[in-house]
Amino acid sequence: MIRQCVSHRGIPCYRLAVRRVELTEPFHHPSPRPLGRKNWSTSDEAKSKRAAMRKGGAPPPEHEDWELTVGIEIHAQLDTDAKLFSRASAALDDVPNSNIALFDIALPGSQPLFQPSTLIPAIRAAIALNCDIQRIRGQRIYELTHRLIEPYAKNGSIWLGAHDGIAKEDGEGVQIGIKQIQMEQDTAKSQELPSSTYLLDFNRVSRPLIEIITLPQIHSATTAAACVRKIQAILQSVGAVTTGMEMGGLRADVNVSVRKRSEAAGDHQYDGVAGLGQRTEIKNLSSFKAVEYAIIAERDRQIAVLKAGGTIQGETRGWTLGSTETRKLRGKEGEVDYRYMPDPDLGPVIIGDDVISDLRRNIPVLPDELLQMLVQDPKYGLSTVDAKTLIELDDGQRLEYYQDAVEILITLQPDLSADFSAGKVVGNWVLHELGGLLTKSSAHWDSQRVPAQSLAEIINLLSRKNITSSSAKSLLAMAFDGDKRSISQIVEDKNLLFQSLSRHEYIALAEEVMRQNPKMVSEIREKGQLGKMGWFVGQIKRIGDPNRVEAQKAEEILRELILK
């Protein structure tokens, strides 16, 4: 059971609901910087730096004597309808300032009211990341304040394998420790307009977040990006977060330090890891590539400073998309004491062991287990690359669609040979054929654009040789473009059912294309340029009926006639 204890003052917390707050006057503040986009450097040096970033995070030869160390702080929006300290809705897409309580905007006299349901996705995240729920006096308990004083989970870890895209120097895998996870609340959203005007939307205030802090055990920018990607996949798989980095539901800060391997260990220690160099923190990175490129830029900057005889200052820095350098935001000397203290209106929260046990029993399949299933289960039989792509695309929606299509196709084909791999075929169509249409149209994923039932029916017709490959792709394109007819109706209306050519008809078509291209026939016969057979197959499809020509049969006839 999860329960909130009564405040020691015995005073219940009430919320005075506010349906909507309208600001009659815009909020003005003199802008400290000019508006407009910062010009990117066009120098040869900057171009070469960006090219090096695109090639990956491996250090150049001149940096091999330097050790990079990275720790990551991930901030993720919890998947919950409730705010952390008020009863207002946590919905983000509603009208600005429509989901706020008096406490959200800190009106005098308003009091926080902790919402226990926000703990459920937070605990799921801790379990999935192998953390221990914090224990005090034999109970799972921690004090609440507007930022929780004590982390509710500690001492976790995740494993990154080669399939996760780690750096080559990390070998087959690396384990990264999770120092702690704590709950936080989000802040208001601001929008900057011309004339030093800012619009404020308080809907996001008090929306619950978790902050996941890794140990500084990462030594490659590539592995750091892989770590963030893996944690995002884990959080999504257990329903702990709303969306990923792609949709703004997850952000990362990185702590970066370097030290020379050939010299004595550094004087700094962070989170129990000693012998490190002075670290800097890069804030608010919103994509996996941003994590990787920002670390590379800061690594190179610190090495250049130290080589020139300078010292690294503890500071907070920023990085902008397209930039090859980080920029200073503010100084940061030592650990900051935020002087958090318990709120007298918020009593301790006790999380029962039965809740932990129940959530642990019902935790969904984690990404590594899912990857293993998609690769090793004969029903799917995907390659590791395709399986990972499906898991990561569209917050897992593409994977659900794929699995639905596989199940439907299997029910449509109880009589087909066991050699037919439904999972592999469907995977190819979902990732490449359907994925190609999405890329070409720049459309977002929508599982109903081509329902899984329709895709399975197309693949079923193709595998039974009732339609040709080109007809199958045409059917998919028509469904994708909004044709609401059933697949069977389109096949009937367009007369797409395959009617095989006779052997005599194949020979006649083959002889015709050979007669038109005697030089290429000679090159195949005399020089063994068999790759040109495919061109001849294409010509047979061009002069014949493409809906009746089987590429394999056409090539067999061509080989028979040309190589006899």
Swiss-Prot record:
Cited PROSITE patterns: GATB
Keyword Ligase: yes
Catalytic reaction annotation: L-glutamyl-tRNA(Gln) + L-glutamine + ATP + H2O = L-glutaminyl-tRNA(Gln) + L-glutamate + ADP + phosphate + H(+)
Cellular component terms (Gene Ontology): glutamyl-tRNA(Gln) amidotransferase complex; mitochondrion
InterPro entries: Asn/Gln-tRNA_amidoTrfase_suB/E (IPR017959), Asn/Gln-tRNA_Trfase_suB/E_cat (IPR006075), Asn/Gln_amidotransferase (IPR018027), Asn/Gln_tRNA_amidoTrase-B-like (IPR003789), GatB (IPR004413), GatB_Yqey_C_2 (IPR023168), Gln-tRNA_amidoTrfase_suB_CS (IPR017958), Gln_synth/guanido_kin_cat_dom (IPR014746)
Keywords assigned: ATP-binding, Ligase, Mitochondrion, Nucleotide-binding, Protein biosynthesis, Transit peptide
Transit peptide per record: 1-88
Location of the region described as Disordered in the Swiss-Prot/TrEMBL record: 26-63
Main location: mitochondrion
Gene Ontology terms describing biological process: glutaminyl-tRNAGln biosynthesis via transamidation; mitochondrial translation
EC number assigned by the record: 6.3.5.-
Protein origin, superkingdom: Eukaryota
Enzyme class of the recorded protein, top EC level: ligase
Cellular compartments annotated: Mitochondrion
Summary of the function given for this chain in its UniProt record: Allows the formation of correctly charged Gln-tRNA(Gln) through the transamidation of misacylated Glu-tRNA(Gln) in the mitochondria. The reaction takes place in the presence of glutamine and ATP through an activated gamma-phospho-Glu-tRNA(Gln).
SUBUNIT field: Subunit of the heterotrimeric GatCAB amidotransferase (AdT) complex, composed of A, B and C subunits.
UniProt family annotation: Belongs to the GatB/GatE family. GatB subfamily.
Protein name per Swiss-Prot or TrEMBL: Glutamyl-tRNA(Gln) amidotransferase subunit B, mitochondrial
Organism: Ajellomyces capsulatus (strain G186AR / H82 / ATCC MYA-2454 / RMSCC 2432)
